UniProtKB/Swiss-Prot annotation:
It holds the Pfam family UPF0102. It comes from the Bacteria. SUPFAM superfamilies: Restriction endonuclease-like (SSF52980). This is UPF0102 protein sce2912. HAMAP family: UPF0102 (MF_00048). Belongs to the UPF0102 family. One of its GO terms (molecular function) is nucleic acid binding. The lineage of its organism: Bacteria, Pseudomonadati, Myxococcota, Polyangia, Polyangiales.
Length: 144
């Protein structure tokens, strides 16, 4: 008698899905690709990349760059082509406040005493991936 494998129960599917590991891994990978695209875009413009995924306590800054005398704190967002919501629209007031808080702490701890650095600004970067895999990058300086 040949036995077939039992069908996955709704419970086991829910348990696997609720862990979110595959979805979370995919989001992290997409986020890393978006940050790669932003860093490449900035480097091509002669902007110095100071740090990626900079931790400030429990807060994180996606990209820290030096644009002449300015330290740019950059929040990176991504969406697929054809998304109904623009990537930049996903930076809500709460996220802006967290990024500002992280940037201000980083400024006090690191950049306030660096020669040649005059100020800090908060930029937003939107990365859209086309079906071909090509990325388009839009950076809004002093976005918030």
């Amino acid at each position: 008698m040949t036995r077939s494998a039992p069908a996955a129960s709704a419970t086991s599917r829910t348990a696997i899905g609720s862990a979110g590991a595959p979805a979370a891994d995919a989001r992290r990978a997409l986020g890393a690709r978006a940050e790669d695209a932003v860093v490449a875009h900035l480097a091509a413009q002669g902007v110095e990349i100071v740090a990626r995924n900079a931790r400030v306590g429990r807060l994180e800054i996606d990209v820290v760059a030096r644009d002449g005398p300015v330290i740019a704190i950059i929040e990176v967002r991504t969406r697929g082509a054809g998304s109904y919501v623009r990537a930049l629209d996903s930076i809500d007031a709460r996220k802006r406040a967290r990024v500002r808080r992280a940037g201000e702490r980083l400024w006090r701890a690191t950049f306030s005493r660096v020669r040649g650095v005059e100020r800090m600004r908060f930029d937003a970067a939107s990365v859209t991936f086309l079906p071909s895999g090509e990325a388009t990058v839009e950076i809004i300086k002093a976005a918030f």
